[in-house]
Amino acid sequence: MTIITPITNDPTTALLRLMAWLSPVFPVGSFSYSHGLERAVHDGLVVDAAGLQDWLQWLVRRGSGWNDAVLCAESWRCTMKGEDLHEIAELAEALAGSRERHMETMLQGGAFLAAARSWPCEIFDRLPPDCAYPVAVGAVAGGHGVPLAQALAAFLQAFCINLLQASIRLSVTGQSGVTAIMAALEPVLGETAARAALSSMEDLGSATFIADIMAMKHETQHSRLFRS
């Protein structure tokens, strides 16, 4: 029996779906990725809560977090307009700057689509079988009528929370430090989500070169906790 999940115009339903899809327990395997943070800690570039907060805010504002938010927004818009999603999916995959970043976004994207099928939607038939994570999230959010700004804010927060969880395992900070950083990042997440909601493909671009290099160097790190 096929269960059809209706497109929502109810803000509470939209919130519940975002909280489910972007929860740390949603089965995308996010806990196994550090996005290069493990190497940054290893090399002494991130050693405390202040450095971690700075690292995260620039990833969100000017780094891979920003690019992913732009891709997520474009995927959402293509979905709402009924446009083809293959081109944006190919671009998102091509923008992965290293082998482990590529693995991180593609495996999470595939796992997200598989798990999100518990909320049936026609968008799954329009997506390529291999899909980068931000494109998958944007398309599913758009397919269910979840407002763009809220989807982007939740997506960016989930990105940061995953790295904050990694920071605890890497002994950069503890739970009290993580909650303080979460609170401090709220304005950054809100402002970046608002910018991304108004973005176009011309706004793609990042300037967090050290973070990108750390992601590359992690590929040759022998002792590790994370896959990226």
Curated annotation (Swiss-Prot):
Keywords: Chaperone, Cytoplasm, Nickel insertion. Pfam families: UreF. Its main location: cytoplasm. Disulfide bonds: none annotated. InterPro entries: UreF (IPR002639), UreF_sf (IPR038277). Gene3D superfamilies: Urease accessory protein UreF. One of its GO terms (molecular function) is nickel cation binding. GO terms for cellular component: cytoplasm. It is found in: Cytoplasm. UreD, UreF and UreG form a complex that acts as a GTP-hydrolysis-dependent molecular chaperone, activating the urease apoprotein by helping to assemble the nickel containing metallocenter of UreC. The UreE protein probably delivers the nickel. Required for maturation of urease via the functional incorporation of the urease nickel metallocenter. Belongs to the UreF family. This is Urease accessory protein UreF 2. It comes from Brucella melitensis biotype 1 (strain ATCC 23456 / CCUG 17765 / NCTC 10094 / 16M).
